[in-house]
């Protein structure tokens, strides 16, 4: 029994440290892993990227509307029911290259 007394004392000294572990400071400690993930909510990086994605989608819709209007105007000017595929392809490529970053 005397052999295990130091081991038991060390174990009893470490138990309060385990329960007093600050999970805000050591979020990846095995005892804190589940707690901090449940409390954190959404990741801030995702919240920052969502408006950028929405803005990109809005710009894409505006660009497509502008291209459709330009194609319709060019078709009316040319008095033609069809627009050539090469002209349409060139127009789309040029519009994509001119799009502000």
Swiss-Prot record:
It comes from the Eukaryota. Expressed in coelomocytes, the ASK sensory neurons and interneurons AIB, AIM and PVQ. Keywords: Chemotaxis, Pheromone response, Secreted, Signal. It is found in: Secreted; Perikaryon. One of its GO terms (cellular component) is perikaryon. The keyword Secreted applies. GO terms for biological process: chemotaxis; regulation of chemotaxis; regulation of olfactory learning; response to pheromone. Residues 1-20 form the signal peptide. May be degraded by the nep-2 peptidase. Its main location: secreted. Negatively regulates chemotaxis and olfactory plasticity which is the change from positive chemotaxis to dispersal after prolonged exposure to an odorant. May be down-regulated in response to pheromone exposure, resulting in promotion of olfactory plasticity. This is Protein snet-1. It comes from Caenorhabditis elegans. The gene is snet-1.
